[in-house]
Amino acid sequence: MRMHLSTLLVLTALMVGSFAQQIREGAKMEVKPDSIWFSEVGNLSTWQKLKKAGNSAEFESYQTKELGARHAWQFTKPLTVKIISFEPQKNQAKVQLLTPGRYLGSTWWIDGNAFSK
């Protein structure tokens, strides 16, 4: 059992690491539709912790509060961004929006899982 768990952990780390290598400064990437975008990294960190904790009621409440306060946004279409920085340990990216429109050039913090693969 212990050997199987170790193998699973190594394979998971390799999969995450291989995708994280694609997320690099200066890269242009597409963000999935309906992803949550944060104006402050602290709000993203809290969102990630609540999501990981598994308490869906608390997570949904926080997300709704952040969206309502305009500390976070949810765009319904896929959008193109430029990676400003990426922290693989935290799975957090600071991005600049490249898709033409009202928010062109704005900077955001997003979860690393928000990128299209």
Task: Locate each region found by the language model.
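SH3/SH3-like beta-barrel superfamily modules
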Residues: 72-112
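N-terminal signal peptide c-region/cleavage motif recognized by signal peptidases
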Residues: 15-17
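Bacterial N-terminal signal peptides that target proteins for export
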Residues: 1-8
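Beta-loop motif signature
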Residues: 22, 27-83, 87
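Active-site phosphate/ATP/adenylate-binding loop shared across adenylate-forming ligases
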Residues: 12
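Intrinsically disordered, low-complexity regions enriched for glutamine and histidine
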Residues: 2, 19-20
